[in-house]
Amino acid sequence: MEEDESTTPKKKSDSQLNLPPSMNRPTVSLESRINRLIDSNHYHSPSKPIYSDRFIPSRSGSNFALFDLASSSPNKKDGKEDGAGSYASLLKTALFGPVTPEKSDVVNGFSPSGNIFRFKTETQRSLNLYPPFDSDVVSGVSPSPVKSPRKILRSPYKVLDAPALQDDFYLNLVDWSAQNVLAVGLGNCVYLWNACSSKVTKLCDLGVDETVCSVGWALRGTHLAIGTSSGTVQIWDVLRCKNIRTMEGHRLRVGALAWSSSVLSSGSRDKSILQRDIRTQEDHVSKLKGHKSEICGLKWSSDNRELASGGNDNKLFVWNQHSTQPVLRFCEHAAAVKAIAWSPHHFGLLASGGGTADRCIRFWNTTTNTHLNCVDTNSQVCNLVWSKNVNELVSTHGYSQNQIIVWKYPTMSKLATLTGHSYRVLYLAVSPDGQTIVTGAGDETLRFWNVFPSPKSQSRESEIGALSFGRTTIR
């Protein structure tokens, strides 16, 4: 016999509410409505704003925590559950959603508005979208992508034979022009190698009584200066392969040359430096004295205001355009100073390297006359050159590894160590685009290495870095 559901009492289930006698028991229909409301609050999409009537506020968007729906009695005994409070709490959750703020939160300032009623449901944004100490949240910018270290090939991409290339520490027999032509002094001859066409041209032959001791290109790459063992300096027009001038003044061999616009500086074993203006008829316009031994290194700064000279007396001097005495004297090196290089990135930054007894690369600030840093390379420093594309420099060395080292400045961390020469690497020059270096040694070879990035890639990386640093979230 079937019983009528309206008259037959139902068994108590765990899902029903346990209410005190003082309250009326909710009907099944009310309980089912509460469950439906809870489900709708749990699974509705927060992406769509819900609008209510202009006179009827939105329940889920209103701040009901500003007043108590169910204030608890202060005379309650600890440990006893108030059934009326539980039911009211459940009802509030069903009607207003599970994320209704508490009154304490509103008082403490967590509520964005002090209004109780709202007429639009705003999309809730979680406070835990980011870690509490996320750098992006703190700074408001996206971190720059981690830059992978640049790969430098450990082997030369080209090797040229250079017979009769002298193994003499005090000479400078290799230079690369702005026209992409390499000049090399081999014995008593000078050869030109065109990097674009790989064509080799014999520029001159000094004869059996003289040898080439130094070569140096003018800035435009149309004229080449040649220092000889007799003390003369010859100026050659490379387009016509013609000697247009021979200048005297030194008594001994000329092992170092440096151009500054129309002024040519020459350093000799006679311990002097001659300043020659090729626009005048005089062989030299001034004579610089200060070194006590052979001049083996000469370099003008990029702004042509200062001339650095290194000698076999272990001294590094700095001269200005008008002085006949050095304006700065650096005496920290313990061996001959041939390796000299001015930074193209920092005004007044000068690097120098010492010979076998010194083995150090030192950095100087010529504007403040200060010694900045010293790096022990553990081998003879034969030559130095800065990259014009990046803040890096290359050093070439002698005993015992005859290595070539690429350094990152100012950390002086080694980016690459290149080996291959069997004799000390005495000669070094950079291509006009700043990407390739050529090294020469007493093993009678010239080796070409790709060590520096191109100017375009470097500028592109700078742009990307700047854009990454300034990137913010678009709202």
UniProtKB/Swiss-Prot annotation:
The similarity comment for this entry is: Belongs to the WD repeat CDC20/Fizzy family.
Q: Which InterPro entries match?
A: Cdc20/Fizzy, WD40/YVTN_repeat-like_dom_sf, WD40_CDC20-Fz, WD40_repeat_CS, WD40_repeat_dom_sf, WD40_rpt
| This protein's name | Protein FIZZY-RELATED 1
Which compartment or compartments is the protein found in?
A: Nucleus
In terms of PANTHER family, this protein maps to:
CELL DIVISION CYCLE 20 CDC20 FIZZY -RELATED, FIZZY-RELATED PROTEIN HOMOLOG
Report one GO cellular component.
nucleus
Q: What else is known?
A: FZR2 controls the induction of early rounds of endoreduplication while the remaining rounds may be mediated by FZR1 and FZR3.
Report residue spans for region: Disordered: 1-27
The protein's role, per its UniProt record: Activator protein that regulates the ubiquitin ligase activity and substrate specificity of the anaphase promoting complex/cyclosome (APC/C). Required for meristem organization and maintenance of quiescent center identity and stem cells.
Q: What gene is this protein a product of?
A: FZR1
Instruction: Summarize the subunit comment.
Output: Associates with the APC/C complex. Interacts with CDC20-1, CDC20-2, CYCA1-1, CYCA1-2, CYCA3-4, CYCB1-1 and CYCB1-2. Binds to GIG1.
